[in-house]
């Protein structure tokens, strides 16, 4: 039996009498949302009980309708639908020389939106063993990989995904390097250069490799011990270096966890999250070539 299959079988046994809460924020993700709903329900079926909390905002596609249908058909699902006035975030200036993807304006918004599900858990006094935070716009969630995370024998606080995508040149890359902070480098400022370099340095993580200790990671899906993060909130951490104005909102949770002595964060190589379909990447590349 491979290490992956062994972890999967142990994970099944570990969680059969435990509870989990899935949390997500979504916007304009109708295309991938349908099959990801099925995967969330599959993962949830391994647990004694599961709850889904989703905050949607400002979608222009069929996301709102899909979510409302899901909530009607599954009483484990809570959906909050909204159209927010987002001009207030535009009042936060983006300083010259900083990337808009890594700026205070964007991360302030992301932190505010993500705090909604943590505040919902607190205000409704929800209890659980685990909280799984997931991006429902990803192309594919490896269900078996998620369950394998619970089979690890060493103590852990957070387990993040092995996320991957293809570059414009179709080269495999680790996708979520903005949220990735290597163990021991948490006091070193990030830069656009290191974020980009890590996409390829971390590209070849594969099944059956040992879990990798990091300071921070997300990867589109991460598992947290409920008791450790139920009272935490996302916030903005200045970076102010190398084109990166602030750190990713996920880093703020790990910063608080470390302060409390809960810094055992790992990437599970088996818990693969595919961010985009290769065919869509090829299509966009062809489209770009035609429109030159």
Name each model feature, range by range.
Residues 1-42:
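N-proximal low-complexity "stem/linker" segments adjacent to membrane-targeting elements
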Residues 19-21, 51, 252:
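Cell-envelope/extracellular polymer assembly enzymes that use nucleotide-activated donors
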Residues 38-49, 59:
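Short, acidic, metal-binding catalytic loop of nucleotide-sugar glycosyltransferases
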Residues 55-66, 83-88:
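A conserved acidic beta->alpha catalytic loop
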Residues 62, 111, 115, 119, ...:
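Acidic donor-binding/catalytic loop of UDP-sugar-dependent glycosyltransferases
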Residues 70-128:
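Active-site-proximal specificity loops/subdomain of glycosyltransferases
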Residues 138-236:
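Conserved catalytic core of nucleotide-sugar-dependent glycosyltransferases
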Residues 203-292:
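C-terminal catalytic/acceptor-binding lobe
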């Amino acid at each position: 039996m491979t290490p992956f299959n062994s972890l999967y079988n142990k994970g099944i046994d570990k969680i059969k009498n435990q509870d989990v809460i899935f949390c997500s924020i979504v916007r304009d993700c109708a295309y991938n949302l349908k099959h990801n709903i099925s995967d969330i329900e599959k993962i949830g079926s391994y647990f004694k009980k599961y709850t889904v909390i989703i905050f949607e905002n400002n979608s222009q596609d069929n996301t709102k309708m899909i979510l409302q249908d899901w909530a009607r058909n599954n009483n484990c699902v809570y959906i909050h639908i909204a159209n927010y006035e987002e001009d207030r975030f535009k009042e936060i200036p983006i300083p010259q020389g900083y990337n808009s993807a890594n700026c205070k304006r964007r991360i302030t918004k992301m932190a505010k939106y993500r705090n909604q599900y943590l505040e919902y858990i607190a205000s409704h006094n929800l209890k659980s063993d685990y909280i799984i935070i997931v991006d429902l716009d990803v192309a594919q969630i490896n269900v078996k990989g998620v369950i394998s995370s619970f089979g690890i024998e060493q103590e852990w606080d957070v387990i993040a995904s092995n996320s991957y995508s293809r570059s414009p040149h179709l080269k495999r890359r680790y996708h979520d390097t903005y949220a990735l902070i290597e163990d021991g480098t948490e006091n070193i400022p990030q830069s656009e250069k290191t974020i980009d370099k890590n996409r390829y340095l971390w590209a070849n993580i594969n099944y059956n490799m040992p879990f990798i200790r990091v300071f921070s990671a997300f990867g589109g899906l991460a598992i947290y011990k409920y008791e450790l993060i139920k009272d935490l909130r996302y916030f903005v951490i200045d970076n102010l270096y190398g084109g990166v104005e602030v750190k990713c909102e996920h880093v703020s949770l790990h910063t608080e966890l470390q302060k409390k002595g809960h810094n055992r964060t790992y990437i599970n190589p088996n818990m693969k999250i595919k961010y985009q379909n290769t065919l869509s990447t090829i299509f966009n590349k062809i489209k770009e070539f035609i429109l030159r």
